[in-house]
Amino acid sequence: MKAEQQNIKRLLNTAKGQIDGLNKMIDDDKYCIDISNQIMATIAILKKVNIEILDAHLKCCVLSRR
């Protein structure tokens, strides 16, 4: 498995864990601001995943076709 794929999977697993944590926070009726902060942290990880995927696409699919 490529290093990029391993990093993407690691980030996605982290986001999955955060989403599971969010579900528990909602079930436990946690403070809304804490939930919001966790949502923002999850969004940040998903943005990193998107950047990694687009970067890999540029390197693999776009630049190699020149």
PLM region spans:
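Solvent-exposed interaction patches of small proteins and small membrane subunits
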Residues: 1-66
